[in-house]
Amino acid sequence: MNAYVVRLNNAVAAFNNDCMSTSRPLRQSDYNECAAIDSQTLTDFLLLRNSNAFADGSRWLEQKGNLQRAYIALDQYLTVIYDAWGLNLEYENPAEGVDRWMEPVRADQDASGNSMAAAHLNETLASISL
């Protein structure tokens, strides 16, 4: 999970750095990284969800549930950036459509401008005790 969080944080940083770039290959590469994270985390989530390696009533079964919730929270945060990239790539010059492609990001912000999905992910990660 920690490796995915690092990759997600890097993807968010790449979005912040590259979203206004007119280099389509750069923006496409950033979008592709989001797609790769999405695919890999879904695979790992499904493997965990379908695993029978945890005994009923054990503390590990509870942690399995916490890990599953962490994968879901990570995906929810990733989806904000992934969706924004998808809209961003519709524009040759992203400055022309900034209001449109920033919609997913703005929809995720609380009154202070902070990401609600990021806050939820951090809360969920704090619940994991391995």
Model-flagged regions — what are they?
Residues 1-39, 66-130:
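C-terminal amphipathic alpha-helix
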Residues 58-61, 65:
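Surface-exposed short loop/turn segments
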